[in-house]
From Swiss-Prot:
It comes from Klebsiella pneumoniae subsp. pneumoniae (strain ATCC 700721 / MGH 78578). NCBIfam families: PRK11194.1, rRNA_mod_RlmN. This is Dual-specificity RNA methyltransferase RlmN. [4Fe-4S] cluster binds at C129, C133, C136. It is found in: Cytoplasm. GO terms for molecular function: 4 iron, 4 sulfur cluster binding; metal ion binding; rRNA (adenine(2503)-C2-)-methyltransferase activity; rRNA binding; tRNA (adenine(37)-C2)-methyltransferase activity; tRNA binding. It comes from the Bacteria. Specifically methylates position 2 of adenine 2503 in 23S rRNA and position 2 of adenine 37 in tRNAs. m2A2503 modification seems to play a crucial role in the proofreading step occurring at the peptidyl transferase center and thus would serve to optimize ribosomal fidelity. Reaction proceeds by a ping-pong mechanism involving intermediate methylation of a conserved cysteine residue. GO terms for cellular component: cytoplasm.
Amino acid sequence: MSEQIVTPDTAALTVPNKDAKINLLDLNRQQMREFFKNMGEKPFRADQVMKWMYHYCCDDFDEMTDINKVLRSKLKEVAEIRAPEVVEEQRSTDGTIKWAIAVGDQRVETVYIPEEDRATLCVSSQVGCALECKFCSTAQQGFNRNLRVSEIIGQVWRAAKIVGAVKTTGVRPITNVVMMGMGEPLLNLNNVVPAMEIMLDDFGFGLSKRRVTLSTSGVVPALDKLGDMIDVALAISLHAPNDTIRDEIVPINKKYNIETFLNSVRGYISKSNANQGRVTIEYVMLDHVNDGTEHAHELAALLKDTPCKINLIPWNPFPGAPYGRSSNSRIDRFSKVLMEYGFTTIVRKTRGDDIDAACGQLAGDVIDRTKRTLRKRMQGEAIDVKAV
C-alpha cells in the first residue's frame, strides 16, 4: 500500500475536455474567484454565486436574481452546479437517514444523524478504502478511487437540500460534519481539504471549525501536512492499546506505529484552535480482542501524554466479519478503568444499525480496483458484504 499526498491547487479549474462544463461545486472560494476573474468578472461575483449555491442550495443560475442576465447566460455556457444524486434512501427508527449517492457508476453512503441539540452528517471521501481494517465493512469492499471535491461537498449540499425541504417537526438542519464515512480522508487531501474549506467558508456552509471533524487511521505524512493546510477537529481511529493488536486490526500501523502516529497527532493539536488542546480517540470494542481491563490500563498508560477524550464504540457487525461485539458489562468495566485514570470517556450510542448505517457498516457499491474480494476468495475466506 502506498499513499500519494497532493495539496490543493488550481487543478479543479481544469475540465476533462474542451466541451465539458466546469462544475462549480469543485471550486473553493479562492478558485471560484479565479474562475470569475478569467471570465472578466469582479471577484465579488464569486461570493454572490457561492451564497446562492450553499446558503440556498440553488443549482439553477436563472434563480440567482441579483446576478445580471448577461452573466447568467455566460455561466450557463461554461459552468454547472451538479451535485451527486441520491439513488436510495433508508430511514431508521431512531431518525437516522442513510443515503446511497451515485458517483459515476458506483455508490457511496452518507448518513444524517439527528440528536436533541444537533444534526451530524457523516460524509465519505473515497469509493471504498485501501486500508483494510479488519473490523470495517467498507474495507472489505476494496478501493476504487478518490472522490472529487464536488462529490464530497455535494454530499453535504444534497443532504442540506433534502433536510431543508422537509417541514416535519424535529428535522434539524445540519450543524456538524464528520469525515468518517467511506474511505481514509488523508489519502485524498487534494479534494478533502478544499471541500472542508467550503464547509467552513462564510459563503459556503459557514460551519465552525469545531463542528467539522476529520477522522484518520494514521497516514502520518499527510497528518503532518494537514496542520499547515486547515484547522478542523481531529479524531483518530486508534482501536488498540499496543502495536501487536493494532498491527492485526489496523494494518497501516505496520507502516506508522502508534508512537509515530501519536507524535504526529500531538503536533497537529498543538497548533490547532479547533481542537482546544485535545484530540478525540476512537476505540471500537471487539469482544476479547481489545476490550479487557488489562487493555484499558494499557490504553491509559499509552495516552497519558496525549490530551484527549475517548469514545468507546460498540462494534457493529456485518456478514462474514471475524469478530463479536463486546458485551455491555465488558464495555462498562473498560470505561470505568479509563475514568479512574481521569479520562473523559464516552460510550457512543449506536445509531442507524437497523439500516446498516452505524459506524463501520457503510459499504456502498464499489468496483474494486484493488481486487481485494478476488484475493479473499482465492485465499478461501468468505466475503459477504451487503451493498445498498
